[in-house]
C-alpha cells in the first residue's frame, strides 16, 4: 500500500502520541525520523545509548516508509504496524529485550 509522505508522517506521529504517559517524558529527547528506504529491509532502527545512560549518543529512531508500505495492505494495517514499530524501537531505548517490548 502506497501513501504520501505526509500521510505516513501522520501515522508516525499518531504512534508517538500513543506512547503511555508514564514514558513520554523519557522520550521527549528522542529524535524521530522518517526515511524512505532501509537498505536492510528494516521497519525501524534505534540508535543511541539508551535511557539509562547519562551521557552518550543522542537517541534517534528512524521509521522506514517503504518497508511499512510493503508490510501493509490497508491504511489501518499500516497505522498498526507503524505503532508496533515505534513502540518496539522505544523499547530499545529503555534497554528492553524482545519479549519485554510494550506492544
Question: Language-model features: where?
Answer:
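Short secondary-structure boundary micro-motifs
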Residues: 1, 15-17, 75-77
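Hydrophobic or amphipathic, alpha-helical segments that drive membrane association/targeting
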Residues: 2-11
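Acidic-residue sensor for enzyme active/binding pockets
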Residues: 9, 81, 89
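Auxiliary, metal-adjacent structural segments of Zn-dependent hydrolase domains
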Residues: 10-11, 16-62
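Short alpha-helical functional segments enriched in proximate histidine and acidic residues
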Residues: 18, 22, 85, 89-93
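Active-site scaffold of zinc-dependent metalloenzymes
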Residues: 47-83, 93-103
Amino acid at each position: 500500500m502506497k501513501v504520501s509522505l505526509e500521510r505516513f508522517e501522520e501515522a508516525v506521529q499518531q504512534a508517538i502520541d500513543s506512547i503511555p504517559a508514564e514514558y513520554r517524558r523519557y522520550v521527549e529527547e528522542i529524535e524521530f525520523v522518517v526515511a524512505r528506504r532501509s537498505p536492510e529491509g528494516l521497519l525501524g532502527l534505534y540508535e543511541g545509548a539508551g535511557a539509562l545512560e547519562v551521557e552518550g549518543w543522542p537517541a534517534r529512531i528512524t521509521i522506514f516508509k517503504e518497508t511499512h508500505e510493503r508490510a501493509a495492505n490497508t491504511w489501518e494495517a499500516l497505522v498498526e504496524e507503524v505503532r508496533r514499530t515505534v513502540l518496539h524501537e522505544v523499547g530499545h531505548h529503555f534497554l528492553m529485550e524482545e519479549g519485554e517490548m510494550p506492544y
